[in-house]
């Protein structure tokens, strides 16, 4: 990805204390830095409304309570959602930056916003912000997540080569040993001939380990199995469960690792989760050293990109970038499954399905020349359908959860 005259790129960084501070500069004019401060009372109330609309549990809530609240809230009703995302746009997009971007659009140039959110803006669905009638921010620009300079410019970091026809290490809804319903299947049964099955068939010659016929719900995909495969792959494609903890490096990926595996997390019900620290520092006490990630990584799981909410924003996304990834797609909040939608969303039917199309869209984006532009294109299509029809399958509660870190 290059900052060409056809694609002017701006780096936008946010920091919060009692107020919200912005700094931005265009990559073709790095010395021209703009700084503004927005009073806290102008932004905290609408951010509180956003938190109340999202499926991430609030203090004292269970996961089911959070899902029921969110799936009966603003993101399930087009008019209420537009009111919320319009208020977010007015509160959060700096007027001066908007003017600069509009000037570029009038010249036929589509900007790229590389955005580094602050602690309190970590869950803002920037792509979905409603900036005008039938227009979201992603309508007029591409958006990606700008990793912290300490991650993207780390002297030991070496970005892995992108190999368009390279192997894809696909961990698709793995079986977690000893797991109850909280770590059960996120995709449900994948029927032969279904869109997900067709996706696996398309990747068949590149899938490792295994074949298209054995791509889903495997019980043998452990850290010791996939770690050596990732070093030579082009992509890591994970669909499953992520859980957060007290700090970012303890963010946990749930594979098929039993109690006999080694790592920094304690064994829970016969299963040892893989932490971000295991990826960065290595999971074998006898063989210290971090993993080697491929160029492109996708974590389709609950709040897999939620590390910005921590004081030290180093979690799974930063771990993947630090160990070789250039593009990492992850989620900002708890992702409702199809089963969750059918259970709690009043307008859902037994046939309501959202996650398979989402998985397929992320897969296609990560095989494209520009994952950021490709994922944003899919998000624009979903936004247009939501604006036109208001179907819950097109609600931003799923497509706006995703952001791609690029660095």
Language-model-detected regions and their locations in the chain:
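Short hydrophobic alpha-helical runs that function as membrane-insertion/retention elements
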Residues: 327-331
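Cysteine protease catalytic core and zymogen-processing segment of caspase-like enzymes
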Residues: 221-223, 243-326
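Helix-enriched interaction subdomains in cytosolic or periplasmic regions
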Residues: 79-80, 109-151, 246-271
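A domain-level signal for caspase-like cysteine endopeptidase catalytic cores
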Residues: 56-76, 117-121, 145-250
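Boundary/activation segment at the start of structured domains
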Residues: 1-21, 30-31, 120-188, 393-401, ...
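Caspase-like cysteine protease fold
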Residues: 261-292, 334-407
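Non-catalytic, solvent-exposed interaction/assembly segments
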Residues: 1-114, 118-121
């Amino acid at each position: 990805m290059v900052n060409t005259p056809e694609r002017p790129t701006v780096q936008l960084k946010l920091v919060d204390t009692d107020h919200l501070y912005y700094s931005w500069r265009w990559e073709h004019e790095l010395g021209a830095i703009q700084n503004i401060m927005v009073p806290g009372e102008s932004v905290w109330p609408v951010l509180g409304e956003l938190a109340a609309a999202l499926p991430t549990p609030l203090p004292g809530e269970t996961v089911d309570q959070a899902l029921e609240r969110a799936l009966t809230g603003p993101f399930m009703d087009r008019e209420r959602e537009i009111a919320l995302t319009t208020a977010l746009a007015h509160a959060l997009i700096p007027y001066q930056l908007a003017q600069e971007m509009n000037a570029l659009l009038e010249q036929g140039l589509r900007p790229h916003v590389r955005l580094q959110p602050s602690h309190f803006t970590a869950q803002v669905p920037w792509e979905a912000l409603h900036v005008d009638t039938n227009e979201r921010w992603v309508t007029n620009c591409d958006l990606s997540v700008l990793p912290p300079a300490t991650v993207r410019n780390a002297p030991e970091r070496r970005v892995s080569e992108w190999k368009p026809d390279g192997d894809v290490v696909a961990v698709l809804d793995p079986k977690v040993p000893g797991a109850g319903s909280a770590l059960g299947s996120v995709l449900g049964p994948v029927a032969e001939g279904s869109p997900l099955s067709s996706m696996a068939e398309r990747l068949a010659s590149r899938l490792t380990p295994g074949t298209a016929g054995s791509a889903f719900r495997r019980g043998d995909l452990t850290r010791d199995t996939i770690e050596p495969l990732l070093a030579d792959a082009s992509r890591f494609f994970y669909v499953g469960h992520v859980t957060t903890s007290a700090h970012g490096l303890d963010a946990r990926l749930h594979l098929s690792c039993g109690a006999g595996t080694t790592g920094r997390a304690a064994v829970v019900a016969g299963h040892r989760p893989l932490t971000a620290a295991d990826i960065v520092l290595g999971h074998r006490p006898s063989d210290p050293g971090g993993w080697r990630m491929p160029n492109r990584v996708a974590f389709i799981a609950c709040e897999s990109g939620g590390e910005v909410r921590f004081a030290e924003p180093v979690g799974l996304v930063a771990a993947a970038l630090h160990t070789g990834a250039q593009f990492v797609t992850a989620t900002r909040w708890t992702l409702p499954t199809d089963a969750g939608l059918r259970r709690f969303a009043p307008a859902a039917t037994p046939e309501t399905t959202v996650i398979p199309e989402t998985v397929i869209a992320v897969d296609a984006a990560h095989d494209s020349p520009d994952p950021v532009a490709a994922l944003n294109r899919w998000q624009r299509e979903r936004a247009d359908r939501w604006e036109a029809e208001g179907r819950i399958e097109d609600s931003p509660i799923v497509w706006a959860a995703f952001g791609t870190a690029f660095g």
